[in-house]
Every structure is written in structure tokens, then in C-alpha cells.
A protein has these predicted regions:
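Bacterial N-terminal signal peptides that target proteins for export
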Residues: 1-6
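Bacterial N-terminal signal peptides
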Residues: 7-15
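Sec/Tat signal peptide C-region and signal peptidase I cleavage site
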Residues: 17-21
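Conserved polar/disulfide-associated segments of primarily extracytoplasmic proteins
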Residues: 22-56, 70-175, 195, 217, ...
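Short, solvent-exposed coil/turn segments at beta-strand boundaries
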Residues: 54, 61-62, 94, 180-187
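Short conserved aromatic/hydrophobic patches within beta-strands of well-structured domains
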Residues: 61-67, 211-213
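Extracytoplasmic/lumenal ectodomains and periplasmic regions of secretory and membrane proteins
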Residues: 166-234
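C-terminal single-pass membrane-anchor helix
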Residues: 231-287
């Protein structure tokens, strides 16, 4: 009996040591994550930044901005895909984050009718196909549930907008997408937020985007005969632009590349990042 007790005690000691070692490793990983977040070059508003050489964005007070290099690091820290061209803007409380990227695929004609139900099915199929790459990387799969906001095109602002509801192991999030049409292509804006915060976040993003503009000579109205024209219209912008064209041509390597990059942004694995950034700017204000 006594021998059994000592064996049990010894086993408990081993387990306790393993738990302490695991906790120490977790603390070290957390500190490494915080250190990498701290090292990013956070640009605080109010200021105006040049975006990808053809446009400008005014960052309001109480907002922050990351350039392309720092945005790539920020995304990859959270197991989100990046092609290294996106920039990020967000309020300091990190209730939402928006990513901007210009695609020089040509002038997109805006006279196409949008079939929202058909587009939703295509997006759901694309998301499922993209999960193959996420599984290969050891990342959690995504499920596109429904529209949060069906696609709407504003002929005055030349902005196409929609929002989708996505589920993952970490929970539910909303991706709100905007395409701002220009002379030589379009700027994609993807906002990530909690579904409960969507209405307020949309309003805030709309305010921020009033400070975004193409440079002189680069607006949609500046298009001239002879300029490059995209091979697709508004509907294809929603389901992937160049990938939609590739599907018609059988260019499956292009389609595969799109599926790897599609649904880059979901609020997954960002709790620590959001908490740290909030605390960072709170400390700076207090100081």
C-alpha cells in the first residue's frame, strides 16, 4: 500500500513538472508574440499616408495604420494569409480592422446586374476549396454562412460593397468588403469585425474611407479610350476577379492561387493582438 502511495506521489510530481514546463513554454510564446507586436511600426493619426503609389488615405485621430511590410507581419502572426501588398487601418480600440490593396487589372465596367443568391453559392464553394490549403498549413477551416449585407453598388462613389458571415473554430466573424473603382483597376477594402459590431463598424469605416482618394488622373472618371479594360464586371469582383476569368479559360493554377489567398482575413487568433494593441495605446494616452 505504502509503495503504491509513493508511486502515485512520484507520478504526480512528474505530471506537475510537465504542467509547469508547459506553462513556461506558453508564457514564453506569449511574450515572443507581444515582442513582435511591439516591434511593428504603428503610425498614429491624424496623418495622411500614400497608399501603393496611386492614392492617399487620411488617418483620423484615435486611429492607427500599418504599411504593407508591417501589415504582412501582423497578419502572419495571426495565421492569416498575406501577399505583402495590403495596408491596414483600424481604430485604436481595435473593434474592427480594415485592409486595403490595389489591383491593377484595368478599368472595370460597372453596368452588370448582380445576382446575389448565385454569387453566395459561388463564394461558399470557393471557401470550401480554400480550406484544402488551410488544412495543409495546419490552420482552422472556414465556413461561409450567409450574407451579412448583400452586394450593393453606388454609382456616385463607384464603390461596390457587401458583407459575409464566416464561422471558424474560434467563433463567428463578419468580413465587410468594398471595391473602390479607379481608372486602372480597383482598391479592395476588407473590414473584419464581430457580427454584433457590424453596424457601428460599417459607419466608422465609411467615415474613414471619405479620407481615401485616388490621385489626380487615376480616378474612375479619368479613364480614356486606349486604357486597359478588365475582362470582367462587378459580379466577378465579388467572387475573385482574375480567378473568375481563369475559371472560364481553364487556368487552374491561377484559380488555385486565388483560393490560397481568398478569405485572407478573419478575426481568428487575434484576441491577444487586439488586447495588446489596446493596452499599448491606452498606456501612451495615460503617459
Amino acid at each position: 500500500m505504502l509503495r503504491s502511495i509513493w508511486v502515485a506521489v512520484a507520478l504526480l510530481a512528474v505530471v506537475s513538472a510537465q504542467v509547469r514546463a508547459a506553462d513556461a513554454d506558453a508564457d514564453a510564446d506569449k511574450q515572443a508574440f507581444v515582442d513582435q507586436m511591439r516591434a511593428l511600426n504603428w503610425v498614429k493619426g491624424p496623418t495622411t499616408v500614400e497608399v501603393q503609389g496611386n492614392s492617399k488615405l487620411t488617418i483620423p485621430d484615435q486611429y492607427v495604420y500599418l504599411d504593407a511590410g508591417n501589415t504582412k507581419k501582423f497578419l502572419e502572426l495571426q495565421h492569416n494569409l498575406s501577399d505583402g501588398r495590403e495596408v491596414m487601418v483600424a481604430p485604436q480600440n481595435m473593434e474592427w480592422m480594415a485592409y486595403l490593396e490595389f489591383s491593377d487589372e484595368g478599368y472595370v465596367k460597372d453596368n452588370e446586374k448582380i445576382d446575389a443568391p448565385a454569387l453566395l453559392k459561388t463564394l461558399q464553394s470557393n471557401t470550401e476549396a480554400g480550406n484544402e490549403e488551410r488544412r495543409r498549413r495546419g490552420w482552422n477551416e472556414l465556413k461561409l454562412v450567409d450574407w451579412a449585407t448583400p452586394p450593393v453598388y453606388n454609382t456616385t462613389t463607384k464603390r461596390l460593397e457587401w458583407a459575409t458571415i464566416l464561422d471558424s473554430k474560434e467563433g463567428r466573424a463578419v468580413n465587410f468588403s468594398t471595391k473602390i473603382l479607379g481608372r486602372r483597376g480597383y482598391t479592395s477594402v476588407i473590414m473584419v469585425t464581430d457580427p454584433a459590431n457590424l453596424q457601428a463598424a460599417e459607419s466608422n469605416l465609411d467615415h474613414v474611407l471619405t479620407g481615401y482618394s485616388f490621385n489626380a488622373g487615376e480616378t474612375y472618371a479619368d479613364w480614356r479610350s486606349g486604357d486597359k479594360v478588365a475582362e470582367y464586371g462587378l459580379a466577378a469582383l465579388i467572387v475573385g476577379g482574375v480567378a473568375a476569368v481563369a475559371a472560364k479559360k481553364g487556368l487552374f493554377s491561377v484559380i488555385g492561387a486565388f483560393l490560397v489567398a481568398s478569405w485572407k482575413f478573419l478575426m481568428i487568433g487575434v484576441v491577444a493582438a487586439v488586447t495588446w494593441v489596446r493596452n499599448l495605446f491606452a498606456r501612451k494616452r495615460a503617459g
